[in-house]
């Protein structure tokens, strides 16, 4: 199963994304097993057709095998799939912090609904504003800061055209549409800064509305909240 772990995928930095990565590897392993089995089965059928062509033989065992094998494969896919759906449902039941994300042409606005007065706009930094080590076209003037090991509910919407709030390293992509509030919950087990971009073509400056999400310790998050509201 680990043969395909992380194959062609980014390293995932959240629990749910890690489970999805494992499920992808598990399915790839199953598909490889199915490919080998079907190849051997067809080889056996072709061989037996020519070898026993003068005899009348009923392939009852082969028919039974072709009925049981797909059923087992489907059950092996169903169990982890339902487990992931159940886990995702539990994540959406409870949250410790709600962050409202609004897409504009061409920047993002963040509002912490549980912390009165904490809201700001996030614009891409120009080249002359970048500090050493900050990525070009991805760094912003105000990052969205959240605490780690905390269940966060994100509410995504738009103030104008359709946008998409996407962070590939977290397996997050949700459309931001005017008049519609899309929600999802996430928990981040590790600290760090994660970058993304609007992945819906939204106008001339579509390529210049990046996303910067900073995950930090709870004490640092509290200090950041007080400092931002001053």
UniProtKB/Swiss-Prot annotation:
GO MF annotation terms: copper ion binding; cytochrome-c oxidase activity
Organism field: Caenorhabditis remanei
UniProt-recorded name of the protein: Cytochrome c oxidase subunit 2
Membrane topology label: Multi-pass membrane protein
Family: Belongs to the cytochrome c oxidase subunit 2 family.
Enzyme Commission no: 7.1.1.9
Complex formation: Component of the cytochrome c oxidase (complex IV, CIV), a multisubunit enzyme composed of a catalytic core of 3 subunits and several supernumerary subunits. The complex exists as a monomer or a dimer and forms supercomplexes (SCs) in the inner mitochondrial membrane with ubiquinol-cytochrome c oxidoreductase (cytochrome b-c1 complex, complex III, CIII).
Location of the protein in the cell: Mitochondrion inner membrane
GO CC aspect terms: mitochondrial inner membrane
Gene: cox-2
Lineage, top ranks: Eukaryota, Metazoa, Ecdysozoa, Nematoda, Chromadorea
Cofactor note: Binds a dinuclear copper A center per subunit.
Major subcellular site: mitochondrion
Cofactor: Cu cation
